[in-house]
Swiss-Prot record:
CDD domains: Bet_v1-like
Identification of the protein by name: MLP-like protein 28
Organism: Arabidopsis thaliana
Protein purpose: Can bind steroids (in vitro), and may also bind other types of hydrophobic ligands.
Source superkingdom: Eukaryota
Pfam family, one: Bet_v_1
One GO term of the biological process aspect: defense response
């Protein structure tokens, strides 16, 4: 990790500006090993995961309005800065996926006690001629008085969070790559944000999976119970679905059900997936969103391929995302 290079000419510019006004800006670059796309996605697509990467600095990020990574949406951060627990309510001002850029405007919270306005822009650029990226942080602000300090410690906070996110992303890559070198085992995970309650979404898979086809008829054509009871460990269900534009089937055994965690695990025991995988487990866990309505659906696919030629089931993970969104719409329409 290269040393952080704060741009001194910019500091001079800040000092000159401050002589006549309370407006200022600070910038710095952080060199990381992760890809620009993945780092950008942490703030645009899943900022609620930043707390996993940097738990000492960020305790949580909740969506208050709109959708993750969409201009106009409101997010709410819990963080620790200068040894104090703080909060920030921010509106997403700009998102440019092709430039891996996102801008947040602080609209409420601790920073508003000292600043009339505060914008944070994060832009991530792939390093020319090599792996890794450069994270460029740009803070633009207006202080409420001359007594307020420039947010240099907050800029350092951004640097620390960047480094921890980088480590987190690299660890995630290793987690997938390491098992694949000696074996054919892998796992894929994703989160889907929904507006429906965790219990109702979980019940669609545990209590009435035969209703999923009503919610997502283009993807799921039916689910029949072959043995046991719906939502019971050991029961066998049989799915008819369309994936990669082909009609397919899957016979699955329910491996685990934890209603208090809104969790269910299916093990594929027969069907099209068994042509390419020795084993395949799908776990669906739904968690209520902290401090607001809605939930997060976490999909976890764990599998062993029959050969290196078999692709990772990334298109199946995307299929799960699409089905989740359609179930959400179906549940909201029922309300």
């Amino acid at each position: 990790m290269a040393d952080v290079a704060t741009k001194h000419p910019m500091e001079d510019e800040v000092k000159k500006t401050e002589a006549s006004s309370l407006v200022g800006k600070l910038e710095t670059d952080v060199e990381i090993k992760a890809s620009a796309d993945k780092f950008h996605h942490m703030f645009a697509g899943k900022p609620h995961h930043v707390s996993k990467a940097s738990p000492g600095n960020i305790q949580g990020c909740d969506l208050h309005e709109g959708d993750w990574g969409t201009v106009g949406s409101i997010v709410f951060w819990n963080y620790v800065h200068d040894g104090e627990a703080k909060v920030a309510k921010e509106r997403i001002e700009a998102v440019e996926p092709d430039k891996n850029l996102i801008t947040f405007r602080v609209i409420e919270g601790d920073l508003m006690k000292e600043y009339k306005s505060f914008l944070l822009t994060i832009q991530v650029t792939p390093k020319p001629g090599g792996p890794g990226s450069i994270v460029h942080w740009h803070l633009e602000y207006e202080k409420i008085s001359e007594e307020v300090a420039h947010p240099e410690t907050l800029l350092q906070f951004c640097v620390e969070v960047s480094k921890e996110i980088d480590e987190h992303l690299l660890a995630e890559e290793e987690e997938v790559k390491t098992p694949e070198t000696p074996s054919l085992v892998g796992k894929l995970e994703t989160d889907v944000e929904i507006k429906a309650s965790a219990e109702k979404f979980h019940h669609m898979f545990a209590g009435k999976p035969h209703h999923v086809s009503k919610a997502s008829p283009g993807n799921i054509q039916g689910c029949d119970l072959h043995e046991g009871d719906w939502g019971q460990v050991g029961s066998i269900v049989f799915w008819n679905y369309v994936h990669d534009r082909e009609a397919k089937v899957a016979k699955e055994r329910i491996e685990a059900v934890e209603p208090n965690k809104n969790l269910i695990t299916f093990r594929v025991i027969d069907g099209d997936l068994m042509k390419e995988y020795k084993s395949f487990l799908l776990t669906i866990q739904v968690t209520p969103k902290l401090g607001g309505p809605g939930s997060i659906v976490h999909w976890h696919l764990e599998y062993e391929k029959i050969s290196e030629e078999v692709a990772h089931p990334e298109t199946l993970l995307q299929f799960c995302v699409e089905v989740s969104k359609e179930i959400d719409e179906h549940l909201l329409a029922e309300e």
